[in-house]
Every structure is written in structure tokens, then in C-alpha cells.
Amino acid sequence: MTQAFNERIAQALKQRREQGLSRQSEVIFSGNQTVLEHQGKRYLNFSANDYLGLANDQSLVRAWQQGLSLYGCGSGASPLVTGYTPAHSNLAASLCDWLGYESATLFGSGFSANQALLFALLEKGDLLVQDKLNHASLIEAGLLSPATMKRFKHNDLKALDTILNRSDCPSLVVTEGVFSMDGDCSPLAEMHALTQRHSASLMVDDAHGVGVLGEEGRGSCALASVKPDFLVVTFGKAFGLSGAALLTDKSSGDFLAQFARHHVYSTALPPAQAFALTHAVEMIRTQQWRRDKLNELQTLFAEYLGEHDSFVATQTPIKPWLIGETQQAVMVAQRCREQGIWLTAIRPPTVPQNTARLRITLSANHTKEQMHTLAQVLLTVTGEH
């Protein structure tokens, strides 16, 4: 490597360390369960996104095993060559039937699905309007796209209206259904009406809403009784697996098959995974008890901790515990681990400056006893117990 690149890398890492923002992966066993192991110690896990408790569900494990016996391991090619199997087709059909769309284009990740649409659809002269707290995949794609990107204050419909009022070019408004770091929901009904009034299109990334909210877990859009032009659902949260799909009308689906490079030039999802995902869709649709359990746990969380200054009320399993200062958040997370609770400090640039927090996530597999332990530890480490 050249000296210039070496120096650049060293300087960037040094700056992150000095800011207290350096990150690293830790080797975790059973990180998809409510009790994980790290370096021989066991912790209650309140950091995973396995909201419905499917990631280690034995029925889903068996479905993947059945898929392996039918299709083998990898897909062997991109979807437009030989990588699109009956398992992929069945998954797409299942998603369309469940969510009410004509087409479902599959991707290896939500990051890819988000970027694929923006890169394929937008041209110079278009207007892209995004919530300031949208996921990094969306913001990055907007910065790199030929369109003009404007960002509006989080969930501020008046600011969005002002931006759209000033434009007469093709416009795409992008938001998240549930925001991953705050756990709050977008005002989708009002936003949908606003985009229709301005003849703008609407894209919703519902990674953290689908499976959790709405009838049969159809997500935040169904809960708000709206149908966006483009709906992204990801499989790494409530589905307990990985990957993503972009739901559209048939014409847009045909367009993506031609021009969405993340889809065209990537190896298709393993067919066994697609087979298991179809089973996950059925579980999500029919096992309402998982969402009922989550609602019970959310009520408990509010009862135990609702009076604390760090508490933030949400209608989702994402429960931010606001700290503010970065080093303080890291210290509180470490003290929680010393008490047997695995929580992760979320720091800038993932969240805005001075809003560092613990991102607490609930799973349908958590017990009431585990919730009580979490509350006791949080109150203890913050000196209010």
C-alpha cells in the first residue's frame, strides 16, 4: 500500500480512538437468543433485532434444513442467469400476497435494496427528499445519485411540504417506517397524503416495522392504512434471517430487473434461505401471540422505567435509553455488562452529537423475569435504585 493511504488510514483510526468512537466486533455465541455467551460469561441479551424470536426457532431451523435438502447450498448465479429458483419465486409470491403488491425484487441486504432503487430510478433534475434520520444506506445513495437531495427535519411535515412546494420536477420522498435508533414511527398517513397532493412518489424502508406492527405484522404502512409506491422490507429483524425485498407494482419490478445493479450483478440469495423465508412469512402472519407478547413486554418496560429521565416512549420494541455524552454512554453500557446485561452504546456518527444512548431491543422470547432484571440493573447503574 502507498504511504499516502497508510497515513490516511492511521490518521482516521487515531481520530476515532481520540473521540471515543472506535468500534470493534466481539465474538458472541448465541447472539440471536435472549441469553448470549461472551468469553465464557453469560449475559441477558437486549441488543439483538430478533423482535419476534424467530432467529433460533426450531421450526424455522427445520425449514432451512428442508431447503438445503431440496436445493443444496448456494444459488450458483445471479437471478437473471440460473440463480432464481422455485424457492425464490415462492418467496416473492408470498410477500406480494401478504403485503398487497404485484412485484417483489429480492436482495442480499436492506442496504442493497435501498441503494438499488435510488441508483436505478433517479436522474439529474430529479428531487430526492429524505428525513434527516434515514438510514446510512439511503443518505449515502442520495449523496451519490445524480438527483438533487434535500433533507427535512425528522418527521417534520411542514418542512417537507415547504421543500415540495418549491419544486416542479419529478420528486421522490423517502422515509423509514420505524426509525432504528429512536424507535419512533413516521407519520405515514399524513406524509402519504402530502406526497399525493404534490404528485411526488413515496418510498418507505420498513425494516423495523414489518412483522411487528399492523394486522398480520404487515408493518407500519399497513398500520397507517397507506400503500407507498416503493416498500422495502428486510429479513434480518422480525424474520430472523437476512436479506431484503423491494415491493412495487409490476412495471417497477420489471424496471428493477433491468436496471437495479445490486440485483442484476449479485449472486442470488441461497435457495434454502429463500425457502426458510417463505416459512417465516407464514409464521409472522399466523402467530399473533408473538406480537401480543411484545406488547406485554413493552407495557412492563414502561411500568418499570417510565418515570426515568432517560426513558423514551415508543410503540415498537426499540427502546432508546438516552444518555447524551458519548463516554458516559460507554461507561453505563460497561456497568450493565458487569451486572450481566448486554447492551450496546450507540454513539455518533450513528446518532447525532450529544444523543448517545443505549439501544434496548425487546424480543418475544424475553421473559417477565428478564425484564425485571433489566429494569433493576438500569436503575442501579444510573444511581436511582
Curated annotation (Swiss-Prot):
Chloroplast among the record's keywords?
no
Binding locations of substrate: 23, 135, 350
Enzyme Commission code: 2.3.1.47
Coiled-coil segments, which residues?
none
- Output the GO biological process annotations, alphabetical, semicolon-separated: biotin biosynthetic process
| Class in the EC hierarchy, top level | transferase
Give the record's pathway: Cofactor biosynthesis; biotin biosynthesis
The yes or no answer to whether the keyword Hydrolase is present is no
Question: Reaction(s) catalyzed by this protein?
Answer: 6-carboxyhexanoyl-[ACP] + L-alanine + H(+) = (8S)-8-amino-7-oxononanoate + holo-[ACP] + CO2
> Which cofactor does this sequence's record say it needs?
pyridoxal 5'-phosphate
Sites bearing N6-(pyridoxal phosphate)lysine, chain numbering:
237
**InterPro entries, per the entry:** Aminotransferase_I/II_large, AON_synthase_class-II, AONS_Archaea/Proteobacteria, AONS_Proteobacteria, PyrdxlP-dep_Trfase, PyrdxlP-dep_Trfase_major, PyrdxlP-dep_Trfase_small
One Pfam family hit: Aminotran_1_2
User: Residues that bind pyridoxal 5'-phosphate, according to the entry?
Assistant: 110-111, 180, 208, 234
Q: Which SUPFAM superfamilies match?
A: PLP-dependent transferases
Q: Which domain of life is it from?
A: Bacteria
Keyword list, A-Z? Biotin biosynthesis, Pyridoxal phosphate, Transferase
Q: How does it assemble?
A: Homodimer.
Indicate what this protein is called per its UniProt record.
Answer: 8-amino-7-oxononanoate synthase
